[in-house]
Curated annotation (Swiss-Prot):
Species this chain originates from: Eremothecium gossypii (strain ATCC 10895 / CBS 109.51 / FGSC 9923 / NRRL Y-1056) (Yeast)
Main location, first listed in the record: nucleus
Localisation: Nucleus membrane; Cytoplasm, Cytoskeleton, Microtubule organizing center, Spindle pole body
Function: Component of the spindle pole body (SPB) required for insertion of the nascent SPB into the nuclear envelope and for the proper execution of spindle pole body (SPB) duplication.
Membrane topology: Single-pass membrane protein
Record key words, sorted: Coiled coil, Cytoplasm, Cytoskeleton, Membrane, Nucleus, Transmembrane, Transmembrane helix
The encoding gene: MPS2
Family: Belongs to the MPS2 family.
TM spans (from-to): 263-283
Protein name: Monopolar spindle protein 2
Keyword Transmembrane in annotation: yes
InterPro entries (alphabetical): Mps2
Record GO cellular component, one term: nuclear membrane
């Protein structure tokens, strides 16, 4: 009796095991169907994304909010050998989720945002996590490779910019040469009847005239800038200050002296004469603090050096036997301190 009961229980157990196997096989086939549904073969990352996406997007809205992104990324670990991201990546994703919590993301936007925050694509991250490699080291290598690529791109951009500048300078040089040849051709075309030597000489003269005209035009512009001091201020509605007036008068005086060198020389000579007279009077002038005795009064002809010298010369010449009296002697002694 008990043997029949045991056989019945064993038969029921086998039926339950077979039913469980059938259900498991059906679920597995359904999962494979989801992975292969759509256009062609689906990648491993896309298949896992579809599974975890349905769990987060329970309302089937077709998008998730940014605040749900950490949960979505964490669910990838159920299908991989280890977590999809490192701790630094999780912090970056959490910061993005807290900064824009209600930002809507569809699957494509999620992939691009994931690549921006993590530094690698979702497919690459899934492959690395599925193989069980040390993730921080691999992701660091990926970031270093990305940084190296950015540095190379920056160097390439700088090199291209320098090359572009060099080409522009060369283009300007060729443009100036072309303009010169064009002027030469037009000149020869208009003077083809003349001889070769005379035509060349005329072309050189015309180029010199053109250069002189350009220099004259530049000098005229500078002259107008120098002469238009107060006029420019008046046109601008500004009142000229004393410093501006002084600078304007100084420029005008300098231009006048440059145009009239003789007048400048005479003015300089006159200024020197006035300075010498004033300084000489200041040096040789009498000191009012020192009282000097008044000199004896002399005749007017003795006050003139030339007339006095002539008088005494004639006197000594024509009156050699003139008698020297006591008065003359006393005057001589007092004069020379004898």
């Amino acid at each position: 009796m008990w043997r029949e009961e045991a056989r019945e229980q064993l038969r029921r157990g086998r039926c339950c095991f077979a039913a469980a196997s059938v259900v498991s096989t059906a679920k597995h086939n359904k999962s494979l169907g989801n992975c292969t549904h759509g256009s062609g073969v689906m990648t491993e990352a896309e298949g896992i994304l579809n599974n975890v996406w349905d769990a987060v997007d329970s309302k089937q809205q077709g998008f998730i909010y940014a605040k749900d992104m950490p949960d979505l990324v964490g669910r990838f670990g159920q299908f991989l050998a280890q977590s999809l991201t490192s701790r630094a990546n999780d912090e970056a994703i959490a910061a993005f989720a807290s900064e824009k919590p209600f930002y809507k993301l569809d699957k494509e936007q999620f992939k691009s945002t994931f690549q921006t925050l993590v530094g690698t694509s979702l497919q690459t991250a899934v492959e690395l996590a599925g193989h069980g490699e040390p993730r921080p080291r691999l992701f660091g290598a990926i970031r270093r490779a990305s940084a190296t690529g950015d540095e190379q791109a920056r160097e390439e951009l700088e090199r291209k910019s320098a090359e572009l500048s060099r080409v522009r300078d060369e283009l300007d040089e060729w443009k100036s040469k072309y303009q010169f040849l064009e002027r030469e051709f037009l000149f020869y075309q208009t003077h083809h009847e003349n001889s070769v030597d005379s035509t060349q000489h005329e072309f050189i003269i015309s180029e010199m005239k053109r250069t002189i005209e350009e220099q004259t035009r530049m000098i005229g512009q500078l002259r107008r800038q120098v002469q238009g001091g107060t006029q420019v201020l008046a046109r601008a509605g500004k009142r000229a200050s004393p410093v501006d007036v002084f600078m304007y008068v100084s420029r005008q005086g300098l231009l006048l002296l440059m145009r009239m060198p003789k007048a400048a020389f005479l003015l300089l000579l006159l200024g020197y004469f006035v300075w010498y007279t004033v300084m000489g009077g200041a040096v040789q002038g009498p000191d009012p603090s020192v009282a000097l005795p008044e000199p004896p009064k002399q005749p007017w002809w003795e006050q003139n050096n030339i007339i006095s010298a002539l008088y005494w010369y004639l006197t000594d010449t024509f009156e050699p036997s003139q008698r020297i009296n006591d008065t003359v002697n006393d005057n001589y002694n007092s004069l020379f301190g004898l």
